[in-house]
Amino acid sequence: MFLLYEYDIFWAFLIISSVIPILAFFISGVLAPISKGPEKLSSYESGIEPMGDAWLQFRIRYYMFALVFVVFDVETVFLYPWAMSFDVLGVSVFIEALIFVLILIVGSVYAWRKGALEWS
């Protein structure tokens, strides 16, 4: 059976780090003046009236690069703790990490074949 008292600091940190932003939003909503006029509802760019349309289209390539970056960033987040405790975990966890890396390699080859990594 797990002894959960070892995680008291984690739970306290989680609760405090969740309560502080909620309180900040609540207090700012209560204390902020409510004034909705035409100036409040108009858009601006750096304090001046906007020139042109407010909606700009961006290329889908930015989205694809961001998606591939997130995949490899998450891979790093998962593999770093494994690498730090490699000598303690054993062979079974090594095999699981290899399977994880192989799945990510298959995904990156798929993205490469589909042209997600090309900037043309």
From Swiss-Prot:
Q: Which UniProt keywords apply?
A: Chloroplast, Membrane, NAD, NADP, Plastid, Plastoquinone, Quinone, Thylakoid, Translocase, Transmembrane, Transmembrane helix, Transport
| Membrane-spanning residues | 9-29, 64-84, 88-108
Q: Where in the cell is it found?
A: Plastid, Chloroplast thylakoid membrane
- Reaction(s) the record says it catalyses: a plastoquinone + NADH + (n+1) H(+)(in) = a plastoquinol + NAD(+) + n H(+)(out); a plastoquinone + NADPH + (n+1) H(+)(in) = a plastoquinol + NADP(+) + n H(+)(out)
Q: InterPro entries from the xrefs?
A: NAD(P)H_OxRDtase_bac/plastid (IPR023043), NADH_UbQ/plastoQ_OxRdtase_su3 (IPR000440), NDAH_ubi_oxred_su3_sf (IPR038430)
Q: How does it sit in the membrane?
A: Multi-pass membrane protein
Q: Look up the EC number in the record and give it.
A: 7.1.1.-
GO CC terms for this protein? chloroplast thylakoid membrane; NADH dehydrogenase complex
Pfam families named among the record's database cross-references: Oxidored_q4
The GO molecular function terms of this record are:
NADH dehydrogenase (ubiquinone) activity; quinone binding
| GO biological process terms on file | photosynthesis, light reaction
| Listed PANTHER family | NADH-UBIQUINONE OXIDOREDUCTASE CHAIN 3
Assembly and interaction partners: NDH is composed of at least 16 different subunits, 5 of which are encoded in the nucleus.
Per the record, the similarity remark reads: Belongs to the complex I subunit 3 family.
Q: So what does this one do?
A: NDH shuttles electrons from NAD(P)H:plastoquinone, via FMN and iron-sulfur (Fe-S) centers, to quinones in the photosynthetic chain and possibly in a chloroplast respiratory chain. The immediate electron acceptor for the enzyme in this species is believed to be plastoquinone. Couples the redox reaction to proton translocation, and thus conserves the redox energy in a proton gradient.
Q: What is this protein called?
A: NAD(P)H-quinone oxidoreductase subunit 3, chloroplastic
Species source reads: Vitis vinifera
